[in-house]
Design a protein with these regions (language model features):
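Ser/Thr/Pro-rich, low-complexity mucin-like regions
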Residues: 199-201, 209-215, 285-315, 330-337, ...
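Extracellular beta-sheet/turn segments enriched in Thr/Pro/Gly and aliphatic residues
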Residues: 159-200, 207-211, 314-351
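Bacterial N-terminal signal peptides
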Residues: 8-17
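Bacterial Sec-dependent N-terminal signal peptides
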Residues: 16-43, 206, 325, 330, ...
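Short, compositionally biased
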Residues: 294, 338, 342, 349-661, ...
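Tryptophan-paired
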Residues: 65-150, 205-324
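C-terminal, surface-exposed recognition/capping segments
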Residues: 505, 583, 592, 597-807
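Solvent-exposed N-terminal domain segments of exported/luminal and surface proteins
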Residues: 24-152, 335, 515, 526-589, ...
Length: 807
């Protein structure tokens, strides 16, 4: 038979062609005591595509779509389709396998393979005789499978027979087909047999039209996604494939493309609007076309954009089944980037379609593309959250969804007090927040997903020229155990990969030039909260610093010491309901800094009458005198994924060392908050971890200096840089200074009054860990101009810089 081009399928597993000549009858897979009789087999191929006068198996699922339509936008027509098969090629039959099953017992009685000449639709075959009424299956264009199905095999198993297929053009392959006759009487019908064949694949054709009214859409990729790997030869009521059983077909990215694919009965639902056919609303394994490219509106800026077209019945928005012998013709006209069309995905996806989510997204401002998106229906990393630390008051399942209907800017920095970090923030119908970068080369912003006026969740956008998320610079840290010390739990020798700078900073370079030093500060976080606060905007020694230029959604400049509330104004409760109320307030008000109320020290709030909780969560008192810690304290311990090994007895460093990222973790995807022991190499003292002796500072030689005058701090001219440079591994500088980490004297925001304090005196970083079972404090790195404390403690209401470790 003449070999024809086969586009889109390649049978991988079962092409065992026997050495038969044209029209030669093959050798049957039969035991010797089964009698056979000659049969004249006649075949026809039921058309996949037909005209009014032609009947087809299921018909033409033709679909005309307009994607992302905006007012006044028109489109060019598609060119001639290339690379697909002609109708004759789609009908061609090269060879056949015949399988005869007895209806009484459902067992294989006989099988045979035969090759056919070009255009031949009849063949002289043999079938078993005298075995009663049978079902005869004919498989075409699949090679010789007779040795793959043993004599006596059950028909039920035969129906599960499948080949693995992949994308590509299979040279010399025609479309696999299947047909059968259920009532062949082997006693009387041996003279002839007629079987109609249908293709075991579906045909997907895309005709793409693009804008022609001044807008430009440049196609970079056209792919068919979620294609079933398995091609079942016989149609059955198979369930939808699993994710592991799916693959992707590529193309030559032209405007007219055809694929031939196995069926994928993904299912259906109640959708009625075609614009709602996007990932959150469709079966997870549904097959779809993904068109990616760059869209440039007339007079506008290019933006990355993707269009998704889910396959299914052309007249039913809720149908997502791709069935065999069916043609799916998609005539798609691109007419804009309207985000009210759920099939339109504007901007580069930072969240990998919701599979790589976090509370912080990092964007490289040197990228030519300025439009980005991330899935805004998932809280943080989507981790399962127990009711103990849930802002909803109940357990939150993993990857639970929220349902925003709009998005807004919360705050942003403006470079030079002019250039905005973001130019646009919006919410798309398909559950993404979309934003466009502003003119700032470095910046920070917080954006929120809302339902009406209520904030459901918010995210930190960190923009920088230094890297994107995949290029974040890290350094190796090693711990330095001093086991056997009183008051400290033993730790083990470990290594971490930690960011080389504070989260949100523009630089990690040690300096004492004001403009450059301010770039190293990053942003501040209260212990256990996911949302950042603006850092100091000065390089001076002050306890009431001005902050970097920051503006709210209305363009109003945010003043220092503003947008604050005492925790007692939220609630003075001390039970789980009160914890829920405070966590919910923090989530719904990401701009608001929550001050502590020291009146929570009284016995009425579970205090000892002397010591406040010093926490932004009211009445978070630790365990004391064999008394359990309060409910708020126990919740606060776990917000960032650490906790105490024993909430009654744990010593310092007796925390959960294996930090598990929570929905409140402020770090980007692939990173999480560090444990308390991460900085233990910063001192060399052997009898403790903390020291004020400069000879025990594990720093570069120039930083072995103390200035004990608090008002002077790092302004002292003997300090070469605005902070300290520590060795993260070993006791000396490695080649290239890769083990030297700079911690700037960025100060912090004070949890008592909200002032930005200790700028030029303290270099800090939060850990994820509470300090100990008897402490209300959180564990952190505490470095002043006169001491180094790798294992220190402080008020959890304070807001400090954060430096994340790689997962």
């Amino acid at each position: 038979m003449k070999v024809t081009k086969f586009f889109g399928l390649w049978i991988l597993s079962v092409l065992c062609v026997l050495s038969c000549t044209d029209e030669e009858q093959g050798t049957g897979n039969i035991v010797p005591d089964v009698a056979t009789a000659p049969v004249k087999l006649s075949l026809d191929a039921t058309p996949m595509w037909g005209t009014v006068s032609t009947t087809r198996a299921r018909g033409d699922n033709s679909l005309d779509l307009v994607l992302g339509e905006e007012a006044g936008k028109t489109a060019n027509t598609a060119g001639t389709r290339a690379g697909t098969l002609t109708d004759t090629q789609e009908d061609a039959i090269n060879d056949i396998c015949v399988f005869q099953f007895g209806n009484a017992d459902g067992k294989l009685k006989y099988s045979e393979y035969a090759s056919l000449t070009d255009g031949q639709l009849t063949a002289n075959i043999s079938l078993a005789s005298g075995v009663g009424t049978c079902t005869v299956y004919v498989l075409a264009n699949v090679g010789d499978l007779t040795q793959k199905v043993a004599y006596g095999s059950a028909v039920a198993d035969f129906k599960k027979f499948a080949a693995e297929v992949s994308s590509g053009k299979g040279t010399g392959q025609n479309l696999p087909m299947c047909g059968y006759k259920t009532d062949f009487n082997s006693e009387t019908d041996n003279a002839s047999l007629t079987v109609s064949l249908t293709r075991a694949v579906a045909k997907v054709s895309l005709n793409l039209t693009t804008p022609n009214a001044g807008d430009v859409f440049t196609v970079t990729s056209v792919r068919l996604m979620n294609v079933a790997k398995k091609l079942y030869y016989v149609e059955s009521a198979t369930t939808a494939p699993t994710v592991a059983e799916l693959t992707t077909y590529t193309s030559d990215n032209t405007k007219s493309i055809a694929w031939y694919v196995p069926e994928n009965k993904a299912g259906s639902n109640s959708l009625t609007d075609w614009k709602d056919r996007y990932e959150d609303n469709v079966p997870a394994t549904a097959t779809y076309i993904l068109i990616e490219g760059s869209y440039t509106p007339k007079g506008g800026i290019a933006r990355d954009v993707a269009y998704t077209i889910y396959l299914g019945a052309g007249d039913k928005a809720g149908d997502f089944n791709v069935v065999r012998n069916t043609k799916y013709t998609i005539n798609a006209a691109i007419k804009g980037t309207n985000m009210n069309d759920g099939r339109v995905l504007v901007g580069k996806d930072l969240s990998a379609a919701g599979t790589q989510t976090a509370n912080c997204y990092v964007v490289n401002t040197t990228d030519a593309n300025k439009w980005y998106r991330f899935k805004a229906t998932i809280r943080g990393n989507g981790a399962a959250t127990s009711a103990q630390i849930s802002y909803t008051g109940t357990d939150i399942p993993a990857n639970d969804r929220i349902a925003p209907d709009n998005a807004a800017l919360v705050w942003e920095t403006r470079e030079g007090d002019k250039a905005p970090t973001l130019d646009y923030v919006g919410y798309s119908r398909n559950g993404y927040i979309v934003f466009k970068l502003g003119e700032a080369t470095e910046g920070n912003a917080v954006v929120a997903a809302k339902n009406g006026a209520t904030t459901l969740w918010s995210w930190h956008i960190w923009t920088t020229v230094a890297f994107d998320r995949n290029g974040i610079k890290v350094q190796t840290y090693e711990t330095r155990p001093r086991n056997g010390l009183a008051s400290y739990a033993n730790i083990t020798k470990r290594e971490f990969k930690m960011m080389d700078r504070n989260l949100g900073s523009a630089s990690g370079t040690a300096t004492k030039v004001a403009e450059e030093a301010i770039k190293t500060y990053g942003v501040y976080f209260q212990f256990g909260r996911k949302d950042p606060f603006p850092a100091a905007g000065v390089m001076t020694r002050t306890n009431d610093a001005d902050i970097v230029p920051v503006y709210d959604a209305n363009g109003n400049k945010i003043l220092k010491n503003s947008n604050q509330i005492k925790n007692s104004a939220i609630t003075t409760g001390i039970d789980q309901t009160a914890v829920k109320a405070q966590l919910a307030y923090a989530v719904e008000n990401p701009l608001v800094f929550i001050l502590r109320d020291d009146n929570d020290k009284t016995a009425a709030y579970g205090g000892d009458g002397t010591n406040p909780s010093y926490n932004w969560i009211f009445a978070a008192h630790p365990a004391k005198n064999d008394k359990d810690g309060s409910v708020p304290w126990k919740a606060s311990n776990k917000l960032w994924g650490s906790g105490l090994q024993d909430e009654k007895t744990s010593l310092m460093l007796g925390t959960i060392a294996d930090v598990k990222k929570t929905i409140y973790d402020p770090c980007p995807y692939g990173y999480h908050m560090p444990p308390q022991d991460v900085w233990t190499n910063f001192t060399t003292i052997t009898t403790a971890y903390n020291t004020g002796n400069v000879t025990e500072y594990n720093v570069v030689a120039a930083d072995k200096y103390n200035q004990t005058n608090e008002s002077t701090g790092f302004t002292d001219g003997k300090f070469e840089v605005w902070g300290r440079r520590f060795f993260t591994t070993g006791d000396a500088e490695a080649a290239g200074a890769g083990n030297v980490a700079f911690y700037p004297a960025a100060g912090y925001r004070y949890g008592y009054d909200g002032h930005v304090s200790h700028v030029g005196w303290g270099c800090y970083a939060w850990s994820a860990s509470p300090y100990s079972a008897t402490s209300q404090y959180g564990g952190f790195l505490d470095t002043y101009s006169s001491w180094v404390r790798p294992v220190s403690n402080t008020d959890r209401s304070n807001a400090f810089p954060v430096r994340c470790v790689r997962d």
